[in-house]
């Protein structure tokens, strides 16, 4: 958990980078939730139900809510993360908490169904300013990937021509997600809500056996084998600030992002 403070209007976020666990777990490694300016903005979808015919399918309610399709993670060829059965034997070491920023690094390497690979995600919370999320994908074979961002049902979500997605609720806390990609020509983004065909997407459950539609931004890129990209996330009560961000260096596991305040 990363937070800027303890008052009612503070920003706080959750980065799920720990071991998967041995029971009651969801396939949500590297998921991020964000609360800011008095309300939930990016969310975990909840659990909805313990009943299902095939909990490995996004056409099954149990499968959708339990597995990666309902979390803020990356899919490979629309497939969920595989199970990662393990127990922590030592503390996580790749994290740092300071007065100016919080940092954590997590890795998922158990594959997505039959697709082998590795997703590494670095989480930075520059306190009272923005979040920078850096992703590195290393896949066994070229695949389509889908980066998901689920919003709380009360959020009204729009997108811009340069593929930013943002909420537009007057007088409330709002959020903007800006992709930081060296070559964005191969990416598309759509916002879905309450989808049932060809599979479930854009559903949220605050309580068991209750569900409702919620917006989900789906960023998709084709023919990805090894790639690095980032997300700049800002919040504010009203209109979130806009920063200019660009990748200035990407080599191996190294990624350098330049961020400039447009205001």
Residue ranges and their predicted role:
Residues 1-41, 99, 222-228, 248-262:
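Carbohydrate-active enzyme catalytic cores, enriched for enzymes
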Residues 42-47:
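Catalytic Cys-His active-site segments of thiol-dependent hydrolases/isopeptidases
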Residues 53-263:
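CBM-like, beta-strand-rich accessory domains located in the C-terminal region of large
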């Amino acid at each position: 958990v990363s937070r800027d403070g303890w008052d009612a209007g503070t920003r706080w976020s959750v980065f799920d980078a720990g071991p998967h666990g041995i029971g009651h777990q969801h396939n949500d490694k590297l998921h991020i939730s964000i609360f800011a300016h008095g309300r939930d903005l990016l969310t975990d979808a909840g659990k909805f139900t313990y009943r299902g015919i095939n909990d490995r399918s996004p056409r099954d309610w149990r499968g959708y809510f339990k597995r990666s399709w309902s979390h803020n993670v990356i899919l490979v060829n629309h497939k969920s993360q595989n199970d990662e059965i393990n127990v922590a034997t030592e503390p996580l070491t790749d994290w740092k908490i300071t007065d100016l920023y919080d940092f954590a690094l997590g890795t998922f390497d158990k594959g997505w169904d039959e697709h082998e690979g590795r997703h590494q995600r670095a989480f930075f919370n520059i306190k009272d300013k923005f979040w920078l999320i850096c992703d590195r994908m290393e896949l066994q074979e070229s695949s389509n990937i889908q980066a998901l961002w689920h919003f709380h049902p009360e959020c009204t979500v729009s997108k811009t021509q340069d593929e930013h997605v943002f909420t537009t609720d007057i007088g409330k806390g709002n959020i903007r997600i800006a992709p930081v990609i060296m070559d964005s020509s191969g990416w598309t983004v759509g916002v879905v809500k309450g989808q049932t065909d060809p599979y479930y997407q854009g559903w949220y459950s605050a309580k068991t056996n209750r569900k409702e539609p919620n917006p989900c931004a789906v960023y998709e890129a084709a023919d990805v084998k090894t790639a690095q990209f980032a997300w700049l996330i800002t919040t504010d009560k009203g209109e979130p600030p806009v920063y200019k961000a660009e990748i200035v260096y990407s080599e191996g596991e190294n990624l350098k992002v330049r961020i400039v305040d447009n205001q």
